[in-house]
Amino acid sequence: MTTVTHGFTSDTLGWRAWLDTVSLDAATPDQLAVLEASHPQAKTSDYYLLLVHLPEILRQRSGVFNAIMYGPGGLSRAERELASTAVSRVNGCVYCASVHAQRFTQLAKRTDAIEQVFDDPATAGTTARERAIVRYAIALTERPDTVDASDIAALETEGLTHEEILDLSHAVAIFAWANRLMLTLGEPVFPEPADSA
């Protein structure tokens, strides 16, 4: 078990919907197909079982999300996960932060940047490039109307290409959406503490 910092953790969390979910027994063939295409664990996730009430929206959402987060080229997968964790931390989405912190750790083989994001996102990043990515993610999350050419120039200074900046912007934007769905339609479920007997 990892440490919980300001309510955030890299532990595996559950998520419980506050609205009714679709029972697999009652799901239409289209709903089942959308679940299968969305995520490997969609059929056991309250989040997907809630969103599949509107299968066409979930189909589109999953396609866009998967293309942004897993598509080839552009920003590295680890950097996308770092930005997503930073957005989730700023938005207060404990569940999304835990998932994407784990993915960053798996891809980057380290936890230092994630620990920094959980502790103080404004100063997080182990390199100038990571700090620029996190700062841009925070700015686009907290003050999108103030992001301008100087923010893009700061990313370029740290070596980000235009394709990488576009990928980063997409990752930040999709998490504005994902975090809001998670925060308004349910709640994270922390694992039960192990007996100390």
Q: Residue locations for each model-derived region?
A:
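Hydrophobic alpha-helical segments
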Residues: M1-A197
